[in-house]
Amino acid sequence: MKKLLMLTTGGTIASVEGENGLAPGVKADELLSYVSKLDNDYTMETQSLMNIDSTNMQPEYWVEIAEAVKENYDAYDGFVITHGTDTMAYTSAALSYMLQHAKKPIVITGSQIPITFQKTDAKKNITDAIRFACEGVGGVYVVFDGRVIQGTRAIKLRTKSYDAFESINYPYIAFINEDGIEYNKQVTEPENDTFTVDTSLCTDVCLLKLHPGLKPEMFDALKSMYKGIVIESYGSGGVPFEGRDILSKVNELIESGIVVVITTQCLEEGEDMSIYEVGRRVNQDLIIRSRNMNTEAIVPKLMWALGQSSDLPVVKRIMETPIADDVVL
C-alpha cells in the first residue's frame, strides 16, 4: 500500500469568497475531504505548510516546501503538493533543483476554480495527482488537466481555461484519463544517482524584459541590488548595441561581477546567439546562455546556482549543465 503525504500551500484550489475577493481559506484536511477515495491502494495524510495566494509566493517558501519533503521523505512513498497556479511553474522548477534525483514522485497541482465551487477542476486535478503519485515515478512533476509535465518545463499560458499549463520545448511525460495513465515519454533515472537536497538559494536575482525604448541607464541601478540578472531579449537572443546601447551596459554589469543570463521572449525553440550580429557581439565566454530553458526555470536555477557559488565559471557551468531535463543541448 502506498503511503502519500499531501502538502498544502493555498492557492485558488483552497480559496473561498471574501470581502475583497477570492482568498485561500480551505484547510488541508478539508481540501482532501472534497475528493472521493480512488481505487488505488494508498493512504494519504495531510500537512498544511502555508495558506497563501501564490502571487505572494517567495523563494523562502520554496525552501520551506523542500525542507518538508526532506523531513518526510523516508516516511512516505510519494508527495502531492497543492499550489496556486500563478507561480506554480517557478515552484516546480525550484523544487527540481533543490530536490535532485528523487526516487519518489513529488507532484504539484492546483486548479483554476476553487474546490468549494460546484463547477471546478480541482477535484480532477487532485485525483490525477494522487493517481500519478501512486505510480512511483521519481522526480518533480506538475499534474494539471490530465497532463503530466516535467517540473522544469511547465509554463502557465492561460489565465482562465482548465488547460492552463503546457510543456514547453519538452514532451509531456504522460496523459491521465478515465482509462488510466498513458505515458508519452519514458522516465529514466540513473540508479547510481542518489537523492540530494540542497536548499541554498541566493535570492538577489532580477528578471528584466527588453523592449524598444528601454533606457540603458536603468542597468546602473541594478548593480548594487542584484548578483544575477536574467535578460529576456528578442528572438534568438540578441542585445541592442545601436541607439539605446544596452550591450555596453550588459558588459559593465559583467565587469562589476554580476552574473548575466540571456534568454528569449519567445516561448518555443530557445535562444541561439550564434546566428545574428546582435547575438555574436555578446561575449560568449562571460555571458550565460539559456538555450531552450524556460524563464520560469532560469530564475530559480540562477538563485540555486548562486547559492552554490559566486564564482562566474562555476555558476556558468551549473547554469549550462542540464538538470532535471531543464535544457536539451
From Swiss-Prot:
UniProt KW keywords: Cytoplasm, Hydrolase
Residue numbers annotated as active site: 12 (o-isoaspartyl threonine intermediate)
Q: According to the UniProt entry, what is the EC number of this protein?
A: 3.5.1.1
Q: Which InterPro entries match?
A: AsnA_fam, Asp/glu_Ase-like_sf, Asparaginase/glutaminase-like, Asparaginase/glutaminase_AS1, Asparaginase/glutaminase_AS2, Asparaginase_C, L-asparaginase_C, L-asparaginase_I
Keyword DNA-binding assigned to the entry: answer is no
Question: What reaction is this protein's catalytic activity?
Answer: L-asparagine + H2O = L-aspartate + NH4(+)
Protein induction? Expression is induced by asparagine.
- Give yes or no: UniProt keyword Iron-sulfur: no
BP-aspect Gene Ontology terms: amino acid metabolic process
User: Gene3D superfamilies given for it?
Assistant: 3.40.50.40, L-asparaginase, N-terminal domain
Amino-acid positions noted as binding substrate in the UniProt annotation, renumbered to this chain: 54, 85-86
Family label = Belongs to the asparaginase 1 family.
Q: Which additional comment does the entry carry?
A: B.subtilis contains two L-asparaginase isoenzymes: L-asparaginase I, a low-affinity enzyme located in the cytoplasm, and L-asparaginase II, a high-affinity secreted enzyme.
The protein's matches in PANTHER family, at most eight in alphabetical order, are given as: 60 KDA LYSOPHOSPHOLIPASE, L-ASPARAGINASE
Q: What is this protein called?
A: L-asparaginase 1
Q: Which organism is it from?
A: Bacillus subtilis (strain 168)
List the gene name. ansA
